[in-house]
From Swiss-Prot:
CDD domains: LIM1_SF3. One of its GO terms (molecular function) is metal ion binding. This is LIM domain-containing protein PLIM2c. GO terms for biological process: actin filament bundle assembly. It is found in: Cytoplasm, Cytoskeleton. Signal peptide: none annotated. Interacts with F-actin. GO terms for cellular component: cytoplasm; cytoskeleton. The lineage of its organism: Eukaryota, Viridiplantae, Streptophyta, Embryophyta, Tracheophyta. Residues 177-213 are annotated as: Disordered. It comes from Arabidopsis thaliana.
């Protein structure tokens, strides 16, 4: 039941309390799903077409216009407070560099590296935007059509079937456990680089033994 209780988190956009069923976390910031909008045009965003800078959300069209096409990041950079000290402007290139650089974060769905432009954080896990899918059916999710339990994502239809209609946590928790187990088994079947490719030392030792024989 704890998953449905209120929180003290405040929405980054409207500054009102965010409850768990309406919560989405992006770039470490809590939002209402309904507040997931471009800060420039106020257009509704979906998971597969948003970009962000320091927690401020944009549609890809305006992100391109403001950051890529203009070539002036400090001028167009919008912060939550809309004001920065002059010496902070010199840090913009560093922010930009870290924004576009690689990370060590792994996608919870495919286990591959997630780069910032394709990264979203939901329920404490990092995902590629294209990997944001229902764990039960694999159908694509949007910010307004997902539900989660124990960090596993579902479309609302299957979450309803597995949890709300049956009124049984065990059923949906079992589905989550099966999902994690299948992911772990897939990881085990992938050969490790050290096992698949012998080192130069191992190759030279084998050649020496063959020569001696």
């Amino acid at each position: 039941m704890a998953a449905f209780t209120g929180t003290t988190d405040k929405c980054k956009a409207c500054d009102k309390t965010v409850y768990v069923m309406d919560l989405m976390t992006l770039e470490g910031m809590p939002y209402h799903k309904s507040c997931f909008r471009c800060s420039h045009c106020n257009g509704t965003l979906v998971i597969c077409n948003y970009s962000s800078m320091d927690g401020v959300l944009y549609c890809k069209t305006h992100f391109e216009q403001l950051f890529k096409e203009s070539g002036n990041f400090s001028k167009n950079f919008q912060t939550a407070g809309k004001t920065e000290k002059s010496n902070d402007a010199t840090k913009a290139p560093n922010r930009l560099s870290s924004f576009f650089s690689g990370t060590q974060d792994k996608c919870a769905a495919c286990k591959k590296t997630v780069y910032p432009l394709e990264k979203m954080t939901m329920e404490g896990e990092s995902y590629h935007k294209t990997c944001f899918r229902c764990a039960h059916s694999g159908c694509p999710l949007t910010h307004s059509s997902y539900a989660a339990l124990d960090g596993v994502l579902y479309c609302k239809v299957h979450f309803s079937q597995l949890f709300l209609e049956k009124g049984n946590y065990n059923h949906v928790l079992q589905a989550a456990a099966n999902h994690r187990r299948s992911t772990a088994e897939e990881d085990k079947t992938e050969p490790k680089e050290d096992e698949a490719n012998p080192t130069e030392e191992e190759t030279s030792d084998a050649a020496a033994e063959e020569h001696e024989s």
